Amino acid sequence: MAEEVAEIFSKHIFSSKYEDLSEKTIKQLKVFLLDTIGVGIAGSTGSKLNELKKIAHTWSKGKNCTVLGTWDKYSRDASTLINAYQIHCLEFDCIHEGAVVHPMAAILSSLLAHCEEINNLGHHTNGKEFLISLALGVDIASFLGICARGELKFFRPATASGFGAVAALSKIQKFSMEEIHNALGIMYSQTCGNMQSHVEGVPILGLQVGFNAKAALASMDLTKAGFPGPKRVFNGCLLYTSDAADEV
């Protein structure tokens, strides 16, 4: 039986260190980090954003985390959803062409909100921890996209990037390999996003990225609470790659 890809991912996420990153990689991480923040600020004028903010505020209470380009404070989950939407809604966010994945919207929005929340509680994240987590998130999301061979039916910038966000959050949380594996499985249970919104050009397209970013946070929370997830995520008979990416 082939080794489960989620297990390979878990080992990779767990064992990778900042020191493994080349100088070129670190430089590019910083470039795309700043680029994504800039795109998120530009997206603060996005379509239906006021409506989104009004409803997102009712979904979860709290004013712990920042929305890009504003002085607004929302709960961790609400700010993640809004920031992911702002980053992707103009479709200026960076893309891995070969993977057909915009990785940073889901990954950075969830990572920023989580780090801001734990910082408010006195648990500080240093730059090296942040960058290796970001790198691993992009690595996993892009790898999933590159492996896909079939016609694009589900919205890969949302589906693949959700797993990338879990990878980044798992690293920043210093999860064990077993915990990372559980988090990936729990994320699979929540993964969503289709191409119909892309075909029709409706604003919910960008929100699909936000839904998965928020789901990544829920996956982290459930894992921390000791909740198990399915283990056969990428190799099982009901696998992600068959359902969402049509991998051969």
Per-region residue spans from a language model:
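Flexible, glycine-rich active-site loops centered on histidine and acidic residues
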Residues: 136, 140-155, 189-217
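Active-site nucleophile and cofactor-binding loops and adjacent substrate-binding regions
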Residues: 99-106, 129-134, 150-162, 205-209
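Single conserved hydrophobic/aromatic residue that forms the stacking wall/gate
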Residues: 240-248
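Generic N-terminal targeting/processing segments that precede catalytic cores or assembly contacts
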Residues: 1-101, 113-120
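Alpha-helical support elements that line or immediately flank enzyme active sites
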Residues: 36-43, 103-128, 163-175
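Beta-strand segments within the central parallel beta-sheet cores of soluble alpha/beta enzyme folds
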Residues: 124-138, 177-189, 199, 231-238
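Acidic/serine-rich, low-complexity amphipathic helices located in mid- to C-terminal regulatory regions
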Residues: 167, 171, 175, 194-234
